[in-house]
Amino acid sequence: MRLALAQLDALVGDLVGNGERILNACRRAAEAGARLVLTPELSLWGYPPRDLLLRPSLLEAQTRALESLAAAMPAGTGVLVGMADPIPGSERPALHNAVALVEAGGWRVVGRKRLLPSYDVFDERRYFRPAEAPSVLELGSDGRSWRLGLTICEDLWVEEELQGHRLAGADPIADLQAQRLDLLLNLSASPFGQGKAALRRRLAARAATRLGVPVVYVNQVGGNDELVFDGAGFVVDAAGALVLQQAWSAEDLSVWEPAASQGSADRPVPAESAAKLAPQGSPTIPPAPGWSLFSLAEPEAPEQLLRALVLGVRDYARKCGFGGALLGLSGGIDSALVAVIACAALGAERVRALRMPSPWSSEGSLTDAADLAARLGLALGTLPIAPLMEAMEGALTPALGGPPAGLTAENLQSRLRGTLLMAVANQEGQLLLSTGNKSELAVGYCTLYGDMNGGLAVIGDLYKTTVFRLCTWLDAPESAACRAALGLPAAGELIGAAIRTKPPSAELRPDQRDSDSLPDYAVLDPILKALVEELASPEQLVAAGADAALVERVATLLRRAEFKRRQAPPALKVSGRAFGSGWRFPIAAG
């Protein structure tokens, strides 16, 4: 039985368009002789659909989409489609996270999710009820009946601990051990995280060895709001060895054919099929027009991170209908990295940058911004804010009893720049990219309605030290191949030593440095990571050897900045815990 893994990039809520995308994949798979096509979790909706699942009109549209798909399916090929299965007569949550088998002429629900994640960015118990029994699909192919275990994403996560707690008490894999399976299938929508692709393979390998059957894993790919899905579907054999690897961060359609002799050892195997061996690492079907493969191999950590951010920006702009992007280019390292990511995601011809110098802007920063723009080939404009500063001072002096001073004057500069950027983005119909990093968002070293302005915080989940490391890698020779693949200049330095080595500064007053207000980032970031991602208490950090006064200061800044983060644009999630939908702390709290 030949299987096809359809790694798809869905638009959330576009049931008609997603259905057409599934159908196109099925037609290509049928041409390759596939009996069954696998699509990701909730593939008809796109993941996560959130409160769209509560709209009755969309549940009705789902039925029409499934019927349309069944009417157009090629004969002899079925597809497993992720969908929401209504529970008749039930109060909310009144749905199952489910899988439908769609074949020519009809469809039926064949599997339901058992483990519903309700942590971090996941909130499935708001919408779904867990299934109580395992799901097994019997499917005929080439004169043989195959028993396929069906699991959905979290159902596989029963062997590892993540974020300091076990993900589930139940064990769907154990409940499948008595089912005499031939294959285990997993339909997933698992977001990107550093090292997560390898973790998924370890989980699948463990399930394979427990059940004694191959595991076929298909994952969603693409960016949906702040979440980035890296794809990287795969097949492991009954011993847990990798036999097929799908593309990383791109749509893909791959075929794999298990040996007829695979499956439970006590199952009868037709003699004529016993010698039919599974191709090890079956070739990927050439991508359809518009489907580009970055790499079939899992990239190294810096490249993973860069490509995840590029994919997130590209899909956010495309799915929100923006034709281009705008950012402020200060000559600092944060905006430089965002400019690189934007050019890789959209093409330099669709990215525009503005320098907005004040009397405190250094000549070096202006030159560095111009040099970077020239290397990237993006359009750079200049809008000095000194005249606007004078006008604001004149307008505010009567109300304040004197000219604005201190933080008020500094924040005015940031807000003037934010206003200019929003005006240009509004006029040109461009996506304004916020350039702040996670360290700044954590401690509130940013200005509401100023440098926080934007539709997407590209590096809002990268600590400042991570920004430095990624930029250092981008300027190193080992990044050349990745840069070339992303359409960036591959020769020489990209960010530039002048930008990488200058002391961080907002340049809002003479000789200002970030270190005037904050600890060095090499000291600050480990404390922030412990407080934010590990949810450690200040007492735990002090007990581990951290300076008590410093920890208390950082914890206080983190707590007091909550009101700013609540008004920040969505930040692409690439860490274990990002500010956004997975960070739910009160503003008014002790």
Protein language model features and the residues they cover:
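ATP/NTP-dependent adenylation/nucleotidyl-transfer catalytic domains that generate, transfer
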Residues: 146, 212-213, 238, 262, ...
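Enzyme catalytic cores with a strong preference for nitrogen-chemistry domains
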Residues: 1-328, 344-345, 380
